[in-house]
Amino acid sequence: MKVFEFLKGKRGAMGIGTLIIFIAMVLVAAVAAAVLINTSGFLQQKAMATGKESTEQVASGLMCIGVTGHYDKTLGGIDKLAIYITPNAGSAPIDLKNAKLFLIYDGESHVLNYSTVTTATLGADDIFNSSAITDWSLADSSSYVVGVIQDADGSLSNGVINKGDIAVLLVNANAVFNKAIPTRSEVSGQFQPEFGAPAVIQFTTPAAYTQTVIELQ
């Protein structure tokens, strides 16, 4: 009986004030839910973008597929280098205009920047023929020239290398090192793009120069 009397004395909260409080609680909950949904969506997009960037960083890059040198009998060594590069499998397009060529020889490190691109190398009988490939003159002590070897979509004309492309870096070794490279000399370095793995360059010149064009790597 006492229980019933106690409950009988209690009245439920009623009125417009209670309704306002209830609506306010619902609105607060709705706003909180919207904030959580927006935050989770933003974080998901951020994670996807970061994952894509990480994948590009890992997969993208360049590889060196060969290095040849030109022997100048008058200078007594290799005066020009042709460094052949191509993108790694799955690589994103790479802008060669922002790439740096690092070369180490005779205890000195040299950094070369992009100069220009030439299509005169397409189908050239001699990549070292400076008469046919006049842009060799733009390869100096601080710059390299990009030559087009294979470029189906014409992207290399703008300095961009992508899937299936092959380019050659024309380097005036005599100007860079202030002398031609003699026999039994070690040269190393890398061609570093703006992002991704670099193309590694490593070779030692032969004990004797018997030909004008020599395969080095």
Curated annotation (Swiss-Prot):
Propeptide feature ranges: 1-12
Annotated keywords: Archaeal flagellum
Family under the similarity heading: Belongs to the archaeal flagellin family.
GO CC field: archaeal-type flagellum
InterPro entries hit by this protein: Flagellin/pilin_N_arc, Flagellin_arc
Source species of the chain: Methanocaldococcus jannaschii (strain ATCC 43067 / DSM 2661 / JAL-1 / JCM 10045 / NBRC 100440)
A single BP term in Gene Ontology: archaeal or bacterial-type flagellum-dependent cell motility
Localization in the cell: Archaeal flagellum
Classification via Pfam families: Arch_flagellin
Example of a GO MF term: structural molecule activity
Coiled coil start-end: none
Described purpose of this protein according to its UniProt entry: Flagellin is the subunit protein which polymerizes to form the filaments of archaeal flagella.
Record keyword Thylakoid present: no
Signal peptide per UniProt: none
Record protein name field: Flagellin B1
